[in-house]
A protein has these predicted regions:
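Outer-membrane beta-barrel pore domains
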Residues: 18-23, 28, 38-213
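Short, solvent-exposed loop/turn segments at secondary-structure junctions
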Residues: 31
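Internal, well-ordered domain-core segments that constitute the primary functional module
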Residues: 1-7
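Basic phosphate/pyrophosphate-binding loop/patch that engages nucleotide-derived ligands
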Residues: 13-15
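Active-site-proximal acidic segments at structured loop/helix or strand boundaries
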Residues: 34
Length: 213
């Protein structure tokens, strides 16, 4: 059958004090028959996912928590953390090497300011193991859609007009695992794939104009 995906999400925000609020979000995604289309989900190690990431289906949970301080009108501050877990990933052998499930991802960050008032400044850190999420469906800005990577990003944003935002970012990432054990090059960052984004450290400045509808 064709690949399908369904999901649900629940979240909310509550005032803790007059100037502090907190919130949380929980999501669950079920990818049915994800292995039916290699263009939809690739577990060949080329983009980070290993053959142990999923067999037929993929079930991934995600949760984010945050707290916001609004003590200064033009300089609110938000701290946040997020986790993701692939319930279908497993340990096993890939290319003759023993591999862990590599199924738990996490990240955190802080934002200060308001793009509509003066500007927004943010910094984030993410740790995305090989099988924690579906490669190519993860953060494309930070890691180009690859898994088995960790790194940070810093960005500044300013609203130019209603629903139009200019954003400057700098992203730096590197592989989490680079084992060369087993037959050939092992399961992580195999050299037969000539992808600099997958194998090498990445340092990338980026400029975006975002339109909101």
């Amino acid at each position: 059958t064709d690949t399908k995906v369904w999901g649900f999400q629940l979240g909310g925000t509550s005032a803790v004090t007059e100037k502090i609020s907190a919130g949380a979000r929980a999501s669950f995604y079920d990818w049915d028959n994800v292995s039916a289309d290699p263009d939809f989900a690739d577990d060949s190690e080329r983009f980070g996912n290993l053959p142990t990431a999923f067999e037929k289906d993929a079930r991934i949970g995600e949760s984010t928590v945050f707290a916001k301080w609004s003590g200064i009108e033009r300089w609110p501050a938000v701290v946040f953390g997020t986790v993701a877990y692939n319930f279908t990933a497993d340990s096993g052998f890939v290319n003759g090497a023993r591999v862990d499930p590599d199924q738990f991802a996490w990240g955190y960050g802080v934002e200060v300011g308001d793009a509509k008032q003066l500007f927004l400044l943010g910094i984030v850190y993410s740790h995305i193991p090989a099988n924690s999420v579906l490669a190519l469906y993860t953060d494309s800005d930070m890691f180009d859609g690859y898994t088995n990577r960790e790194g940070f990003g810093i960005y500044v944003a300013r609203e130019l007009a209603a629903n139009t935002e200019f954003k400057l970012s700098f992203w730096e990432g590197e592989p989490i695992k680079t084992t060369a054990s087993g037959d050939g090059d092992g399961p992580y960052n195999p050299t037969e794939y000539e992808s600099a984004a997958h194998k090498a450290n990445r340092k990338r400045p980026q400029a975006d104009v975002n339109f909101k509808f």
